[in-house]
Amino acid sequence: MVYLVFLCLLPSLISGASILPEPRKDVRASATDAEIQSLAEQFYAADTNKAASGDITLNLQYKASSSQTSTGTDYANQKLFRYVNEAKLFARPTFARLVNLLDNYAQKTGSAESVPTTEVNEQNAFLDEIFKTSIITKLSNFFISKGYYSSAASFKTDLKAMWFGLYTRTSGPLDSSGFEHVFHGEIHKGKVSGLHNWVKLYLLEKSGQVNYLSYSADGVWKGYPDIYAFQLKWSTYLKTIGSFFVGSSPEFDIAMYTLCYVTRPDSLCSVKMGGSIFKIQTYTWANSTYGNGKRFVASSYPI
């Protein structure tokens, strides 16, 4: 596994949410690295909604060196995604709920994000669906057993607040959230910020909005999910290094990121898939809080 350092732009100001879930205890030391790695392996084994080997075909083309990733040079004359079995994957309930959420956000920071009732309903439908899965059940039970939450209901409420609560990255309107940053991506200060979800990347490339330039890392896993680092342009805006789980289910991504965000905030979190260890970097927003002193997700991505 190639280890890389990825930079994610963080918000400049944040505003608290109206949701007041039960306080989460500060018990970072109660989950050991071995326990976190073991749970991540359980997620990997339990991801029944992941893509099979024939469901996605990638066309990686050119591998960029460290000196080439920031140039914006297009080394790939073809698309990254040669084939995705949409009829199979996107018909699965958690994928379908995710796709419904991905058109709810403005591309650029600085524009206020409104959340009408229809979008709140889509958020709730997504959460309801992932909470039916074995992966999220395992995560919830782990958090309860370790004292992070007292119940699945309190965890679910906090999960919604940390991921979907709005804040501002521009000292202006409420224009961002952890979910928007990680799963949708944003244009911030003239660059692509966030965007760490393979489904959104695929949809952007399919619609002609993203131009794939090259890759700089390909994980050791032979099937899905795997981890990649890509260079791309969204419209004219460059992403020098963007890391992704590819072929994973939405519940897998949320579970891995949330596991590390809660237990190892603002840190490199050591996790494991198929016997191979890698890291997830998490960032919290430190200048403002929601609920009883808790922080929104700023970013989370694999390394």
UniProtKB/Swiss-Prot annotation:
Alphabetical keyword list: Endonuclease, Glycoprotein, Hydrolase, Lyase, Manganese, Metal-binding, Nuclease, RNA-binding, Secreted, Signal
EC number: 4.6.1.-
Upper lineage: Eukaryota, Metazoa, Chordata, Craniata, Vertebrata
Keyword presence, Lyase: yes
Substrates-to-products reaction catalysed: ribonucleotidyl-uridine-RNA = a 5'-end dephospho-uridine-RNA + a 3'-end 2',3'-cyclophospho-ribonucleotide-RNA
Family membership: Belongs to the ENDOU family.
Protein's UniProt name: Uridylate-specific endoribonuclease C
Annotated CDD domains: XendoU
Classification via PANTHER family: PLACENTAL PROTEIN 11-RELATED (PTHR12439), URIDYLATE-SPECIFIC ENDORIBONUCLEASE D (PTHR12439:SF43)
GO cellular component: extracellular region
UniProt signal peptide: 1-16
Record: glycosylation sites: N287
Organism expressing this protein natively: Xenopus laevis
